Amino acid sequence: MRNLFIRESGLRILLLIFSLSYLLSAQAQPRQLLVPGGVAIINLEPGNDSGYRFLDKPVLVTKIEGKPAALVGLPLSLKAGEHFIEKSSADQVFKKFFEIKQKQYSTQHITITDKRKVNPYASDMERILAEKARKQKARNHYSMVDVDVDFLRPVEGISTGSFGRRRVFNGQKRRPHSGMDIAADKGTPVLAPSAGTVIETGDFFFSGNLVYIDHGQGLISLFAHLSEIDVNLGEQVEKGQTIGKVGATGRVTGPHLHWSLGLNGNWIDPALFLPVTD
């Protein structure tokens, strides 16, 4: 009888471990959201899973539940309706279709005390345009390496600015919010959510101290408004490594981390790469 109890108890423990492992692995996968600014997850056939493109840019291919799948970043400007990824091979063209629904993002009104950060001087424009080109290059960077899509939250804190919101600074309309804002004390360590390579750093007019990390296959993180930068250009960083500290540099209302996540050249909602509890 005692042996039966031990066997049953052991079975329950194994089942509990399996259930927890499955739950954690399920939470770790990116989540699909078929709206502008979201992510499409498209199943692919083994052996025919490379070379797919969306809007003429290569898409990230990884394993979802052990099977190949494409992760496709959907631009905020994308129209509702049918879209597809495609690849050409010899005389064949392969297409995978998916349907996008429209989403109405809310509007956020923000007061910036440093008016120069809303209406820059003419003397600022050369710097701003040069930095814009550097940002564009970093966002479109592509390296063909395996990607760990099991992301960590880069900093603990309260999310204060939602991705995709239409922003109005001092009564003037600006581009939609391209990332997630997380409020935290100045000096709080900012962690790399996944391994990658530092492809851009510097003190930028609007973004303040920033770091770009290439996670591979067009998956790019941007961390802005840092008080300190703790990594160097070209450095290989590990998941969980401190890359900088929370700050209030650039165009801000207070200390926080701005985290943008780019996929095949499009800014997407970073929350889709975090566990559902976040």
PLM region descriptions:
Residues 2-14:
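Bacterial N-terminal signal peptides that target proteins for export
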Residues 193-227, 255, 260:
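Zn2+-dependent peptidoglycan hydrolase active-site motif and core
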Residues 237, 241-248, 253, 259-278:
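Extended, charge-rich intrinsically disordered regulatory tails
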Residues 97-207:
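Surface-exposed, glycine-biased beta-strand/turn segments
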Residues 12-22:
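Bacterial N-terminal signal peptides
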Residues 27-104:
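Cationic-aromatic interfacial patches
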Residues 56, 85, 159, 182, ...:
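Terminal peptide-recognition signature
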Residues 189-199, 228-246:
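Short, well-structured beta-strand-loop connectors
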